[in-house]
Amino acid sequence: MEASLLKKNQSVELTIEDLTHDGSGVGKIDGYPLFIPNALPGEKITAKITKLNKNYGFARMENIEVVSAERVEPPCAVYSKCGGCSLQHLSYDGQLAFKRNQVEETMKRIGKLNVEVPDTLGMENPWRYRNKSQVPVGFVNGKLTAGFYQKRSHDIIDMSTCLIHNEKGDVAVQKTREILAKYGTEPYDEKTGKGDIRHIMTRFAHTTGQLMIVLVTTKERLPFKAEIIQDLTNQLEVTSIVQNINPQKTNVIFGDRTKTLWGSDIIEDTIHGIRFAISARSFYQVNPLQTEVLYQQAIDSAELTGEETVIDAYCGIGSISLCLAKKAKHVYGVEIVDQAIQDARANAELNNLTNTTFETGKAEEVIPQWYKNGIVADVLVVDPPRKGCDETLLETILAMKPKKVVYVSCNPGTLARDMKILTEGGYEAKKVQPVDMFPMTTHIEAVTVLTLK
């Protein structure tokens, strides 16, 4: 059907055939696809068209005539408004199957790869998994509140709890909000640039139980700062209270200055027996239980004997590097963020791992230089951002020819693209293992190992 034969605000009946990568249902009217949030495959629904483009349109679900067996009642009271989760209406088994199918379909469509995609490694309990809460502060109905933004807006939802946040961190956000309100702290107003408090962040260390509270403010002076700190320490079991100062009129959460107001500068957590010092701004995986699962896949794929030189591109604070260093001859890590490299060096020292070298820079610039200087990896690990590996880095890998490339990915599309380049260059992959790091969302992590033929 031509889009011109359909009209905005028209109600249509259709059957949902599939889910898109962002979890929307897909149904067709005479071959013309409509994307409908919250609809599930197999459901017959009535939907109202909200937008029409030449080749596809969008609609809002009005009624479900035939309900999917995978549909569940979302337990979160603000799920329909909040932008934090997108799959609470799909059973957890259904979410795991959706993520596996996304990886398999992407491998075939983008990578032209016929690889095994086993079942997604999920969680026994897919709730309360996040060790970091980061919420904006604002006025809602004249009172100070802290919560996530409403979908596609910067309106804050007044929420009493978040079911994917660790309970200790969740309680800390609510207590902090109450204490700030008690002292009349003025929330930051994006439109005027006025106000004192921008965000509340909490970090919780799963293995030690340590808690950090971060107050992101517009200036160093915070009215009733001493009283706020006193109340926080009286009411919460807290290890560290930190202030970050961000005076800029921007959507970026953190400013350049961070100072410890009370307690320790860091909290400490462990992954696979490796200790990590985590500061307010450290990059650290947000799901500690699944991080162990993800890293175990990487460790198993590397098959280290103690004789190997390992290069870890995009190494962050050294979390994978240090787990591998226990079993490698030497590990070299590179990361563009200098603070992360400083953290990686400190974490290596904390664990008495002397067989590590960390350097600040772009992986695609530093690794070719290492290669020129005679550093050749037996195993090369990549854990790139969503955009995948830089082309120059892939060219260096193909020139260096490490026996194995262990690829940890947060984007199946760029993983498939990069795997295609590496397989055309002489590597072979047999399987891609999806890991569910972010239940109730559409985000997918996956691990594969490419072996030189």
Swiss-Prot record:
<feature type="binding site">
    <location>
        <position position="285"/>
    </location>
    <ligand>
        <name>S-adenosyl-L-methionine</name>
    </ligand>
</feature>
<dbReference type="GO" id="GO:0046872">
    <property type="term" value="F:metal ion binding"/>
</dbReference>
<dbReference type="InterPro" id="IPR010280">
    <property type="entry name" value="U5_MeTrfase_fam"/>
</dbReference>
<keyword id="KW-0479">Metal-binding</keyword>
<feature type="domain" description="TRAM">
    <location>
        <begin position="5"/>
        <end position="63"/>
    </location>
</feature>
<dbReference type="InterPro" id="IPR012340">
    <property type="entry name" value="NA-bd_OB-fold"/>
</dbReference>
<dbReference type="Pfam" id="PF01938">
    <property type="entry name" value="TRAM"/>
</dbReference>
<dbReference type="InterPro" id="IPR029063">
    <property type="entry name" value="SAM-dependent_MTases_sf"/>
</dbReference>
<dbReference type="GO" id="GO:0070041">
    <property type="term" value="F:rRNA (uridine-C5-)-methyltransferase activity"/>
</dbReference>
<keyword id="KW-0004">4Fe-4S</keyword>
<dbReference type="InterPro" id="IPR030390">
    <property type="entry name" value="MeTrfase_TrmA_AS"/>
</dbReference>
<keyword id="KW-0949">S-adenosyl-L-methionine</keyword>
<feature type="binding site">
    <location>
        <position position="82"/>
    </location>
    <ligand>
        <name>[4Fe-4S] cluster</name>
    </ligand>
</feature>
<feature type="binding site">
    <location>
        <position position="335"/>
    </location>
    <ligand>
        <name>S-adenosyl-L-methionine</name>
    </ligand>
</feature>
<feature type="binding site">
    <location>
        <position position="162"/>
    </location>
    <ligand>
        <name>[4Fe-4S] cluster</name>
    </ligand>
</feature>
<keyword id="KW-0411">Iron-sulfur</keyword>
<feature type="binding site">
    <location>
        <position position="76"/>
    </location>
    <ligand>
        <name>[4Fe-4S] cluster</name>
    </ligand>
</feature>
<dbReference type="Pfam" id="PF05958">
    <property type="entry name" value="tRNA_U5-meth_tr"/>
</dbReference>
<dbReference type="GO" id="GO:0070475">
    <property type="term" value="P:rRNA base methylation"/>
</dbReference>
<feature type="active site" description="Nucleophile">
    <location>
        <position position="410"/>
    </location>
</feature>
<keyword id="KW-0808">Transferase</keyword>
<dbReference type="InterPro" id="IPR002792">
    <property type="entry name" value="TRAM_dom"/>
</dbReference>
<comment type="similarity">
    <text>Belongs to the class I-like SAM-binding methyltransferase superfamily. RNA M5U methyltransferase family.</text>
</comment>
<dbReference type="GO" id="GO:0051539">
    <property type="term" value="F:4 iron, 4 sulfur cluster binding"/>
</dbReference>
<keyword id="KW-0489">Methyltransferase</keyword>
<protein>
    <recommendedName>
        <fullName>Uncharacterized RNA methyltransferase lin1863</fullName>
        <ecNumber>2.1.1.-</ecNumber>
    </recommendedName>
</protein>
<feature type="binding site">
    <location>
        <position position="85"/>
    </location>
    <ligand>
        <name>[4Fe-4S] cluster</name>
    </ligand>
</feature>
<keyword id="KW-0408">Iron</keyword>
<feature type="binding site">
    <location>
        <position position="383"/>
    </location>
    <ligand>
        <name>S-adenosyl-L-methionine</name>
    </ligand>
</feature>
<feature type="binding site">
    <location>
        <position position="314"/>
    </location>
    <ligand>
        <name>S-adenosyl-L-methionine</name>
    </ligand>
</feature>
<dbReference type="InterPro" id="IPR030391">
    <property type="entry name" value="MeTrfase_TrmA_CS"/>
</dbReference>
